[in-house]
Amino acid sequence: MNTGIIDLFDNHVDSIPTILPHQLATLDYLVRTIIDENRSVLLFHIMGSGKTIIALLFALVASRFKKVYILVPNINILKIFNYNMGVAMNLFNDEFIAENIFIHSTTSFYSLNYNDNVINYNGLSRYNNSIFIVDEAHNIFGNNTGELMTVIKNKNKIPFLLLSGSPITNTPNTLGHIIDLMSEETIDFGEIISRGKKVIQTLLNERGVNVLKDLLKGRISYYEMPDKDLPTIRYHGRKFLDTRVVYCHMSKLQEKDYMITRRQLCYHEMFDKNMYNVSMAVLGQLNLMNNLDTLFQEQDKELYPNLKINNGVLYGEELVTLNISSKFKYFINRIQTLKGKHFIYFSNSTYGGLVIKYIMLSNGYSEYNGSQGTNPHMINGKPKTFAIVTSKMKSSLEDLLDVYNSPENDDGNQLMFLFSSNIMSESYTLKEVRHIWFMTIPDTFSQYNQILGRSIRKFSYVDISEPVNVYLLAAVYSDFNDEVTSLNDYTQDELINVLPFDIKKLLYLKFKTKETNRIYSILQEMSETYSLPPHPSIVKVLLGELVRQFFYNNSRIKYNDSKLLKMVTSVIKNKEDARNYIDDIVNGHFFVSNKVFDKSLLYKYKNDIITVPFRLSYEPFVWGVNFRKEYNVVSSP
């Protein structure tokens, strides 16, 4: 990134509509590398650093020269991108061609380019002289989208901007695919990846490290947001290596069915959904069902003496005594005395969603816009509510998050408990979450960090003095109390295989962390910095941010104010051109946020430049007014 741009800012105000200095510095790098040099870039910025806005600002710059295709994982994230495109346009302060920007979900992009599951090669010519931006790039490999991207790369010879945070380091295979897509050479995966008998023994070898450094030199942008302006994290439970874990000892009922399930799966259970299920809760005959929908159709089917299922509805005393789930017994007992909002992660959406819904209802918590809980718990005279988010949700997700994140819901009086599967591990932001729970252990340390990153990020908390509580729950045998202090104690398979499933998963996470940190270090080392005057294509964008910062602290200045002129000439060296720019923003009534007047427009008054607050008013019969000429970013679901 261009550190010369960062040096232009002093005490940057982040609390107003703004482009952060590192985002502008990265934008400069992207323009030079992708547009000027026609080379692909991996934007490896850690969660919460604003990758989306950087990518959209770059798309606006690039639209003046080429067509830009933006691919996102699903329709929900597409909606976020479309919203953020409006934000980026308002901050851009320069010309762009909206009709040259196309935003697609991967499924819609697939339908545009395949006929009967065969790539339509004749149609690929439309991508000549274009740029592709791929969000969550680690998700596109191993499927048709990854295949299509490789074909487009080889056929059209176009550059890619790949966005990713920590998940790119989940497996060396993913990193290998990234290298292959970004470089002009074909990668032999057998040469760069060492494979052992276990998943955790799949590593990027020294040859792979050298290939990574050689082929991606000058193509990596690494950035990690400083940990300032964030609340502290308080981990609960007993010490487990370098973190804390809550041991939830299973009842005899749960442990019995847990062991039956495990024996049937032998030692191949590390990623088996059935082991996720029984570690969360046991449900008798449901434990080993591959098609849960079949059993959901049963009527008054007894699972245990005190638990039945009828047409997909669980009922019985066991939902309250909770011998079926040591994790939920701990959770239900703990939340009764806690204040604030909760975010609860679980990975087994169908099975887990069933268990969660009826345990919560049976214990007095009401479904948001749904069934009321038994003897409901109240807050401010209203029932305490929960919602369950899975990948099956479409249009309702944004509305649900609007309620959960609203300032009126800071204490959870409208929606207190948000349960979510993997869909919430990417792209979404949660606000004012005070308690984060893991009902299942994530597959990777990167995914674990991503889930934390949905909540613990800049601008998500008004009061950062209050800590965020994290509960990592592990279902363990009734007599299991091992102290886990070193990975070196668990190098032999026979020692690992007898451990509870959740403990094995945690050890796997920590083993993989070593590889993750190694690749982080390599990517960080490869990320280039330089100090140059800003690229001509982003000068107006940069000046717009400098002006916003200047007039946040200045409500009224002389028209020939030396500080304003000095700021503008730090970018536009010619003083006459700098004065012309000042004339343009004043006569054009540039929009700023002032600390006294809030939303304001710049005006000339006699020999002064003043910030004039404004408010939009409208007649009751007016439904909407489009204040922007250019808004028609072409998108499809």
Curated annotation (Swiss-Prot):
Annotated GO molecular function terms are: ATP binding; DNA binding; hydrolase activity
Does the keyword field hold Hydrolase?
yes
For this protein, what is the EC number?
3.6.4.-
Concerning PTM, the database record says: Apparently non-glycosylated.
* A Pfam family hit: ResIII
- Where can this protein be found? Virion
Does the entry feature the keyword Transcription regulation, yes or no? yes
* Residue ranges of coiled coil: none
Task: Give the GO cellular component terms, alphabetically.
Answer: virion component
Which keywords does the record carry? Activator, DNA-binding, Hydrolase, Late protein, Transcription, Transcription regulation, Virion
The protein's matches in InterPro entries, at most eight in alphabetical order, are given as:
DNA/RNA_helicase_DEAH_CS, Helicase/UvrB_N, Helicase_ATP-bd, Helicase_C-like, P-loop_NTPase
State what this protein does: Acts with RNA polymerase to initiate transcription from early gene promoters. Is recruited by the RPO-associated protein of 94 kDa RAP94/OPG109 to form the early transcription complex, which also contains the core RNA polymerase. ETF heterodimer binds to early gene promoters.
What name does UniProt use for this protein?
Early transcription factor 70 kDa subunit
Originating organism: Monkeypox virus
